[in-house]
Amino acid sequence: MNNYAFQKLSLSIETLRFPLILTIVFLHCYTSTSAVTRGHDIFFRLIYPLSLWLGETGVPAFFFISGLLLFYSKKTYVQKLKSRFHTLLIPYLFFNGMILCCYLCLIYFGKTILIAGKDLSDYSLIDYLRAFWDRGTWDSGNGSPVLCPFWYIRNLIILVVLSPLLYYILKYTKLIFPVIFGLIWINSHDSAYTFQSLTMFSLGAYFPICDRNLVELFERYKVLFVGSFFFFAIMDFLHLCVSIPFALPFHRLSLVANTFFFISFFGIFLYRHHIYSSFLSKSSFFVFCIHYPFTTYLRPLFERINGLNDIILVVTYLLSVVCVTLICVLVYKILKSIMPGFVTIITGNRV
C-alpha cells in the first residue's frame, strides 16, 4: 500500500474510533435491559438499528482494524508484544482488578455479590485469578472476565501472541482461513466469540499480509461494497417484520459489510466534512473500559417504567446512551486534567 492510501486509511480509522465505541454503548444499554423489555415488540423494532445492527458492529470492526494495523506495522514481533503489553495487558489487568476491588468494598458494607452464580465472598485465590479470564465459566469460548466487555481484549491478546502462526496460515491459505471460520461464526447460534475474533482479525490481517490495498479495492469495487452494505442491512431488518430463513447469518454478514463500509467510506466522509473530535477519539478507549458498570444501573430504571408505552421506553433508551457516554467522557476529562500520567498508563498510552 502506498503512503497516500495508508494515510487515508489511518485517518478513517482514527475518525471512527469514537463512533465505533458509541455503537458498543448502544449495544450494552440494550443488553443490560433486554430481560426487562422483552415483549415490547415496537420498542425492539425501533431501537434494533442502533442497539444490534450498529451495536454489534463495533467489536467485529475493532478486530478487523486490529488485524489490519498489526500486520501493516514494520515492527518486529518482540516490539509488537512490548507495545501490546502497554496498550492491552496493563489496561486489561487494571480495569478488571478495579472492578474486583469495587465488589470487595460492597461486600465489606454488607452487599452480596454473585458472579456467574457464585458468591464472591466464597471465592478462593484460584477463583479470583480466574475472574480475570472467564469468571469461572468458559462456555465454549463465550465466557468473559469480571469486566464483561473485556473478552474482546482477552481474545485480542491471544491473537497478538499467535500472530506469527496466523501470518504463515494467511500467507498460504489467503482468504480460505477467514472464510472457513466466518462460515462457522455466521451459523453459530451462540455468541461465538472465538469464531468472531478469528474471522474478523484474520480478515483484517489478510490485506497487509497478502499485499492487498483495501482503499484501492474499495474504490475499484465501490458499487459492490455499497450494494452489499444496503442489501445485508435490508435483509437484516426484514426479519423484524416477517419470518425469514437464515436471519442470523444475514445479521452477521451485515456486520462484515458494515465494517468494510464504515472503514472505506464512512470514516473518510466524517473526516472530510470535519465531523470529528480529536478529544473524543482519544477518550474512546477509556469510555470502552468504564461504560459497562454504568449500563447495569439501567435495569432498575427500566423495571420502574416497564408498564409505560414503547415510545417512552425508546426515548429512555436513547437518553440512557447519551447519559452513560457523557458520564464516561466527563470522568475521562476530569482524570486527564488532574492525573494525566495515570490516565496515560491505564489507557495504554492512548492520550
Cite the ranges covered by each PLM segment.
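Interfacial loop-to-helix transition and helix-capping segments at the boundaries
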Residues: 47-59, 141-154, 185-202, 236-262
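Loop-centered beta-sheet repeat module
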Residues: 162-211
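Alpha-helical transmembrane segments and terminal signal-anchor/GPI-anchor hydrophobic tails
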Residues: 4, 199-202, 210-286, 292-302, ...
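Aromatic-anchored segments of alpha-helical transmembrane domains
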Residues: 26-29, 96-97, 178-192, 227-241, ...
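Short glycine/serine- and small hydrophobic-enriched flexible loop segments
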Residues: 68-72, 167, 205, 209, ...
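Transmembrane alpha-helical segments of multi-pass membrane transport proteins and ion-pumping complexes
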Residues: 205, 260, 296, 325-333
